[in-house]
A protein has these predicted regions:
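Membrane translocator/pore-forming domains, dominated by Gram-negative outer-membrane beta-barrels
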Residues: 1-187
């Protein structure tokens, strides 16, 4: 949900829920046997944000400066590996993201963008146990700062069809990269 104002300021919010599937096969060694697990975890979340789109250069080109608060909850999960019972605690994630995105219109069908953001995770801790006993596994924590760089494109194939490509790199508390390809049909 997004509301754009004439001065370029916008507010946005979203709700989401789903199921996260995690499968690990033939990795955990139990005696002479390779075993694994398969778990499904319910999650839900929300975000609120505010930003300002500032026109620049050619018509349609802009800089989007924004701030977002993102909340996500992952349910706890119990599973068994080779007779051993494991419990993963629920996780609460609260993040603040401040960033910018530069949008450039290439032609009437193609828009490119790139940007950067700083994100701070306020928590994201997880505790685990085996057969009812707390275990010290240096419980993972995502608390801390991450810098995110992104690049992407939006191609409008027709009035109804469009394709989005996106790539992101993460440095700091979270490290790695992600990408997505999305086809959109508008009614």
């Amino acid at each position: 949900l997004r509301k754009d104002n004439a001065d370029g300021v916008y507010t946005e919010a979203s709700l989401r829920a789903g199921n996260l599937q995690n499968e690990l096969r033939n990795v955990v060694i139990a005696g002479d046997e390779l075993v694994g697990y398969d778990i499904d975890t319910f999650y839900y979340g929300a975000h609120v944000g505010i930003g300002k789109v500032i026109p620049r250069g050619n018509e349609g080109d802009s800089i989007d400066v924004y701030g977002k608060f993102i909340y996500t909850h992952y349910d706890d999960e119990d599973f068994t590996v080779d007779g051993g019972k494991f419990h993963l605690d629920s996780i609460e994630s609260e993040r603040l993201r401040l960033g910018f995105r530069i949008n450039e219109v290439q032609n009437n069908k193609l828009n490119m963008y790139y940007g950067a953001a700083w994100e701070y995770e306020f928590g994201g801790d997880s505790n685990n146990s085996v057969v009812g006993y707390d275990i010290d596994v240096n419980a993972p924590s995502l608390e801390g700062s991450t810098v995110i760089g992104e690049i992407g494109a939006h191609y409008k194939a027709s009035d109804k069809w469009s394709i989005d490509l996106n790539g992101r790199a993460y440095v700091g508390q979270r490290e790695g990269f992600s990408g997505s390809v999305q086809a959109n049909y508008s009614f």
